[in-house]
């Protein structure tokens, strides 16, 4: 697999064409991407005979890292105001439609979308990735707006939106597009769609529980812990959300035990379910619990 420093530099070279792109976006994307790819590498070796896609292919790996970095950057564009609302609207349209951005300063968007379109093992995955990007952008926008609105969401509404704002569907779809994981076919199965919803809910709750102290210190309100405490100050919120997390995890395990999904979906889902311990808690920047910053909404 490509060396970490070299991978970070390649992501940074691409990201320099995006206004507001930071070193942290590249570093965390490579770190998270490495974690995922290492966990599914044996399975990708097994599928390569069918797909012809080498799990060690540097072009595929760097493209995956760049898509993860894009998700981090988009998250911070919403939470930290890295770009103006007009610029963000133009970027969202470009990424969601797969066309060049109408405004200067965001050439990397078109470059990445063109790369993904060219590399797509299954064109259905590229079309789905555009749709997932639109859903992610809309969820980020809605969450940011609700955090400052007079009338706040219920917990159910928050979690429903959070399933899209955690962007796990985007991550999975990008992996499928690059390594031929047949996600477009699997999405037709109700059990697979249920797995997507459950692992995304798990990811949202893990993210919020890990980042709640930092979000509170930074004045962030788009977090399940903070939302529930505002509504119910006497509620044992952390215990409640940990129970919710455990329940979603049990339901996920039941579905995974009942259904047989082709490799590498088992190890991939397991890797994402363990991300709080294996990724968030080992972060030295974005997810450090002692660092005060906004924008802890990003995906793994």
Swiss-Prot record:
Gene3D superfamilies: Farnesyl Diphosphate Synthase. This is Uncharacterized protein blr2150. It comes from Bradyrhizobium diazoefficiens (strain JCM 10833 / BCRC 13528 / IAM 13628 / NBRC 14792 / USDA 110).
